[in-house]
């Protein structure tokens, strides 16, 4: 049995909040560089170049990649042979608070969605998953709301065809347009219940971009990416063939009477950081 203290979790979450907001993921940066080399639209190419330059400046100067430092979503994988000493939830929330203060990251979270009020920095969305082993993995995804606001869920009939599902996903990207700061990473969740499909769509954003995953979804992801990049939305909505960097699909078994499909879009600043303890 491996023992992990709440203090260790707190400090790790704090560091991950800072890293995620200041250092763009290598796979995202690689995808942006690749898109820059392939883009033929002059204005789109200039915008992609500016996005890449911004990422380098953020890392060098220890500044946030984007002024919207997001709502921290923390995914926790807890090994069955791990014992946590202390309050896990309190440790995560304190880690978020410390990370946002130490990293000089904007406070964006309000405690009451109806009354609004002054933003705070000690709140997060926490997802727990129990796995085999004696490791604890923490993944922090700061989700900006320019793109989060474009999330959509559709409860298809179980008789729905693949083309109908593709049409829905593409329509979500179209409606997001320039507001969600393309080029996008498109996360798709299919199956489960309504809430679980939305969870899967967000979790898909943690996947390494354009990795060769030999799954049944691979051809669908590839086809969707090609169709999305024909929309001519382009970087920041000003045209070009780089509307999305990747499409990632996560699936889960569902009820015979339903077919939930959710789409969660990330802007070009797809930020996340993870660590095993």
Q: What does each of the following model-derived ranges do?
A:
Residues 1-188, 193-277:
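Non-transmembrane, aqueous-exposed alpha-helical and coiled segments at domain scale
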């Amino acid at each position: 049995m491996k023992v992990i203290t709440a203090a260790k979790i707190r400090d790790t979450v704090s560091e991950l909040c800072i890293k995620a907001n200041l250092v763009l993921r290598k796979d995202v940066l690689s995808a942006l560089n690749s898109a820059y080399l392939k883009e033929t639209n002059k204005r789109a190419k200039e915008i992609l170049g500016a996005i890449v330059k911004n990422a380098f400046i953020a890392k060098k100067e220890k500044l946030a990649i984007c002024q919207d430092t997001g709502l921290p979503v923390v995914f926790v994988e807890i090994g069955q042979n791990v014992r946590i000493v202390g309050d896990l939830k309190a440790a995560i929330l304190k880690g978020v608070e410390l990370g946002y203060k130490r990293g000089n990251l904007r406070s964006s979270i309000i405690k009451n969605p109806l009354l609004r009020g002054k933003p705070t920095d000690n709140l997060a969305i926490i997802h727990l998953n129990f796995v085999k082993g004696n490791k604890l993995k923490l993944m922090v995804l700061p989700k900006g709301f320019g793109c989060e606001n474009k999330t959509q869920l559709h409860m298809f009939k179980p008789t729905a065809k693949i083309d109908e599902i593709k049409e829905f996903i593409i329509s979500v990207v179209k409606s997001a347009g320039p507001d969600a700061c393309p080029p996008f990473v498109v996360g798709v969740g299919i199956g489960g219940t309504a809430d679980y499909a939305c969870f899967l769509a967000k979790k898909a954003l943690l996947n390494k971009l354009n990795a060769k995953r030999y799954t049944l979804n691979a051809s669908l992801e590839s086809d969707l990416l090609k169709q999305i990049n024909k929309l001519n939305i382009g970087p920041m909505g000003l045209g070009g063939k780089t509307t999305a960097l990747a499409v990632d699909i996560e699936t889960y078994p569902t009820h015979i009477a339903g077919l939930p499909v959710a789409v969660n879009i990330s802007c070009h600043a797809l930020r996340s950081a993870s660590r095993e303890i």
